[in-house]
């Protein structure tokens, strides 16, 4: 860069800093690259599919799928994992359907969980924004976008037409809270429902509620589906679940994970650990027997999973081995610190 351009740039940067504050514009090379902090989903396979070990903090996440596919269960699992790390969590229950007893069975500390059951969509989103701006909340779940009913619709008659009202509400709210979410380093999860578009001849007729704004503002979008039933004899005790990462701004998208959700218990993590351990060579399988580090741990997947449940130390070791192999390592801070410094531009005294 020639001297005249350097002086012009320095003058512009100086004026910007005086007008908007220090840090309004900065060189990316002046700061070490930070790994994006993540909160585990409670599913090891899904954490790996997300690329960073969980859902990213400081971002918006959308989880959508058909009814009874496990959307709320997955978000409660995220809350349980966050609370284990000492995080403060909130649940904005726009559907008025949160079951504290079920949440407790999934590992959620319901005594410490903040819950709001707002009357209108405006109230729900305003409460969410105020919680974010407090800088004291780590995870907020909004259940669901479809239940964020605009005030005008509630006060109107049952047959009144309110075209695009909810979409405008979501668009305005997301414009307002996105920057606050980043500054507060808070994870905000929106649960959404599926609707069918009429008259679609080609492609999928499925769409989500609340317009297109959430699709743009979300850093991660998860499509969760129930693919089958988990049975013990003739009794159905859970569901086979597939989650596809349809959008990901923090890692490569379109990966997917499959796991089981057991009724009244949540995500079947130990069974998932057995499957991933066998797949990646950490657990040996011979016939119906499973072995770890040369020692047999059980006959059949169910017995092996029970062994893991009784031995949390082995679970922690196996999980670390799988994560170390499959997850991208964090940026090398030492290497970043040792790189050549970026040429600094001297600030000029003149104003533009």
From Swiss-Prot:
Subcellular location: Cytoplasm
Region Disordered: start-end pairs: 333-352
GO molecular function annotations of the record: ATP binding; ATP hydrolysis activity; ATP-dependent DNA damage sensor activity; damaged DNA binding; single-stranded DNA binding
Role: Can catalyze the hydrolysis of ATP in the presence of single-stranded DNA, the ATP-dependent uptake of single-stranded DNA by duplex DNA, and the ATP-dependent hybridization of homologous single-stranded DNAs. It interacts with LexA causing its activation and leading to its autocatalytic cleavage.
Acidic residues bias (residue ranges): 343-352
Matches recorded under InterPro entries: AAA+_ATPase (IPR003593), DNA_recomb/repair_RecA (IPR013765), DNA_recomb/repair_RecA_CS (IPR020584), P-loop_NTPase (IPR027417), RecA-like_C (IPR049261), RecA-like_N (IPR049428), RecA_ATP-bd (IPR020588), RecA_C_sf (IPR023400)
Protein name: Protein RecA
Keyword Electron transport on entry: no
Coarse class of the protein's main subcellular location: cytoplasm
Keyword list, A-Z: ATP-binding, Cytoplasm, DNA damage, DNA recombination, DNA repair, DNA-binding, Nucleotide-binding, SOS response
Binding-site residues, ATP: 65-72
Pfam families: RecA, RecA_C
One GO CC annotation: cytosol
Keyword Cytoplasm in record: yes
Biological process per Gene Ontology, one example term: DNA recombination
Family: Belongs to the RecA family.
């Amino acid at each position: 860069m020639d001297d005249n351009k350097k002086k012009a740039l320095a003058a512009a940067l100086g004026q910007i800093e005086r007008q908007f504050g220090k840090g309004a514009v900065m060189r990316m090379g002046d700061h070490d690259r930070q790994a994006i902090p993540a909160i585990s989903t409670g599913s090891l396979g899904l954490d790996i599919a997300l690329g960073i070990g969980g859902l990213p903090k400081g971002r918006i996440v959308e989880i959508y799928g058909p009814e009874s596919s496990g959307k709320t269960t997955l978000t409660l699992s995220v809350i349980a994992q966050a609370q284990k790390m000492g995080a403060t969590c909130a649940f904005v229950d726009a559907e008025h359907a949160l079951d504290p007893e079920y949440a407790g069975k999934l590992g959620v500390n319901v005594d410490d969980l903040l819950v709001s059951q707002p009357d209108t969509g405006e109230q729900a989103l305003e409460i969410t924004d105020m919680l974010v701006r407090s800088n004291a909340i780590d995870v907020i779940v909004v259940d669901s976008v479809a239940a964020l009913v605009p005030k005008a619709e509630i006060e109107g008659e049952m047959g009144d037409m309110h075209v695009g009202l909810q979409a405008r509400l979501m668009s305005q709210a997301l414009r307002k809270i996105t920057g606050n979410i980043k500054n507060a380093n808070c994870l905000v999860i929106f649960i959404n429902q599926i609707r069918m578009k009429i008259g679609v001849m080609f492609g999928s007729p499925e769409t989500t509620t609340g317009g297109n704004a959430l699709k743009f503002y979300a850093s991660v979008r998860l499509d969760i589906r129930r693919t089958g039933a988990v049975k013990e004899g003739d009794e159905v005790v859970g569901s086979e679940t597939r989650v596809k990462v349809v959008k990901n701004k923090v890692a490569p998208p379109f990966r997917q994970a499959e796991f089981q959700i057991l009724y009244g218990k949540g995500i079947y993590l130990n069974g998932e650990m057995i499957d991933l351990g066998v797949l990646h060579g950490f657990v040996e399988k011979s016939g119906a027997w499973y072995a770890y580090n040369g020692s047999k741990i059980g006959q059949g997947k169910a017995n092996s999973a029970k062994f893991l449940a009784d031995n949390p130390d082995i679970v922690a070791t196996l999980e670390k081995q799988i994560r170390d192999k499959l997850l991208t390592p964090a940026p090398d801070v030492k290497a970043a610190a040792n790189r050549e410094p970026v040429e600094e531009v001297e600030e000029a005294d003149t104003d533009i």
